């Protein structure tokens, strides 16, 4: 897994004062990592097949009440209800923990299954206040709708998923799925990931403490 973080060189005026006593939006250049990888071999065909069966069996537990996702969607606690969903969630977390500028310990906050039928769609939305959101693609018929990130600096970014693909992206960026134009169903497992607070983590071992790199004392003056 390679992380590329190459900031764009842009000449900006300095010393811009910020407003006080109010919430205001500012344009700040921030790169947003998105990770796409096929993990079907890691998940295994057995687990992959069971995920599909569970999504089909569970059906639409929201009865189209979710306005942002107009498709059949399960409740958001599938990782607590089914060991298979927990297993795939844990695999995703192992990747997500390495995606930030510094490694952090994470856990699944939500996990669900989605089945898109013909003409189903998801309007642009985000999953704040989670850190990461993700999708693992269980069934992707030929001609399926892409996953779209509509607010890219250079235009819309598209992911045309394949069966077994995993897509991890920052939870606060908007994403959408255009209406499906194929007759076959499109299925995925979705999830959100949150940071584990330090108070919930075990104390480090003596060996881990020894391996901590001490900060440099050569301060720039």
Specify the residue positions occupied by each region the protein language model found.
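Non-heme Fe(II)/2-oxoglutarate
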Residues: 2-103, 220
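Alpha-helix boundary/capping detector
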Residues: 77, 190-193, 215
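Catalytic core of non-heme Fe(II) oxygenases with the double-stranded beta-helix
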Residues: 104-178, 184-188, 192, 196-199, ...
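Short, cationic low-complexity segments
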Residues: 209-221
């Amino acid at each position: 897994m390679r992380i590329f973080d190459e900031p764009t060189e842009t000449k900006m005026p300095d010393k811009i004062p910020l407003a006080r006593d109010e919430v205001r939006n500012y344009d700040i250049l921030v790169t947003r990592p998105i990770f796409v990888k096929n993990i079907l071999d890691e998940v295994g065909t057995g687990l992959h097949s069971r995920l599909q069966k569970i999504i089909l069996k569970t059906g639409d537990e929201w009865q189209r009440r979710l306005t942002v996702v107009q498709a059949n969607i399960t409740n958001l606690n599938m990782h607590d209800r089914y060991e298979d969903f927990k297993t795939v969630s844990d695999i995703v977390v192992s990747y997500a923990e390495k995606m930030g500028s510094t490694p952090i310990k994470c856990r699944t906050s939500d996990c669900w299954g989605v089945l898109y039928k013909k003409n189903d769609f998801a309007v642009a939305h985000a999953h704040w206040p989670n850190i990461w959101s993700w999708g693992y693609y269980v069934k992707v018929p030929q001609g399926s709708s892409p996953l779209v990130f509509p607010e890219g600096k250079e235009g819309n970014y598209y992911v045309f998923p394949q069966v077994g693909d995993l897509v991890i992206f920052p939870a606060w960026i908007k994403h959408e799925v255009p209406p499906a134009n194929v007759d076959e169903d499109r299925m995925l497992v979705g999830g959100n990931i949150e940071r584990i607070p330090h108070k919930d983590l075990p104390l480090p071992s003596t060996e881990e403490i020894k391996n901590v790199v001490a900060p440099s004392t050569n301060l720039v003056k």
